[in-house]
Amino acid sequence: MGGALSTVFGSGEDATAAGTESEPSRVLKFSSSARWQLHFNEIKESNKLLVVDFSASWCGPCRMIEPAIHAMADKFNDVDFVKLDVDELPDVAKEFNVTAMPTFVLVKRGKEIERIIGAKKDELEKKVSKLRA
């Protein structure tokens, strides 16, 4: 049920997994390349920092760092956090030259400004804090 909306917007499960009922997670998840592209085009018009978390459901380090990503999204509410599964969106992973998971690509105005490969929570948090302004 809800196939068309689930395809366009993705399932809401991952987007709210680390949140509470009154406060859902701020990490967006896209299961559709078209929906991702719409979001990417919209955000590149702003000066807002975008953190793209390329992960996979089978990736242990990806699952390990996920709670920290949700905490960062709550802490840095002026930053846009997006989680993309490389198996669901291989074309987007290829476009960003992602070859290992997790890979975090930090983007501003549509341009990559930083890349972190691996579950390096402290490094990611420092870079997000520095680049969000």
UniProtKB/Swiss-Prot annotation:
Subcellular location(s): the record lists: Cytoplasm; Mitochondrion
| Disulfide-linked positions | C59-C62
Q: CDD domains this protein is in?
A: TRX_family
Q: In its keyword annotation, does this UniProt entry include Electron transport?
A: yes
Q: Where are the transmembrane segments?
A: none
**Span of domain Thioredoxin:** 6-133
- Among the Pfam families in the record, one is Thioredoxin
Output the Gene Ontology cellular-component terms: cytosol; mitochondrion
The source's superkingdom equals Eukaryota
Q: Which InterPro entries match?
A: Thioredoxin, Thioredoxin-like_sf, Thioredoxin_CS, Thioredoxin_domain, Thioredoxin_H-type-like
Where does this protein have coiled-coil stretches? none
Q: Where is this site: Deprotonates C-terminal active site Cys?
A: D53
Q: Where is this region: Disordered?
A: 1-22
The GO molecular function terms of this record are: oxidoreductase activity, acting on a sulfur group of donors, disulfide as acceptor; oxidoreductase activity, acting on paired donors, with incorporation or reduction of molecular oxygen, reduced flavin or flavoprotein as one donor, and incorporation of one atom of oxygen; protein-disulfide reductase activity
Q: What does the UniProt keyword field contain?
A: Cytoplasm, Disulfide bond, Electron transport, Mitochondrion, Redox-active center, Transport
The record's note on quaternary structure and interaction partners says: Interacts with MDH1.
Family membership noted in the UniProt record: Belongs to the thioredoxin family. Plant H-type subfamily.
The record describes the protein's role as: Thiol-disulfide oxidoreductase probably involved in the redox regulation of a number of cytosolic enzymes. Possesses insulin disulfide bonds reducing activity.
Q: What is this protein called?
A: Thioredoxin H2
Source organism per UniProt: Arabidopsis thaliana
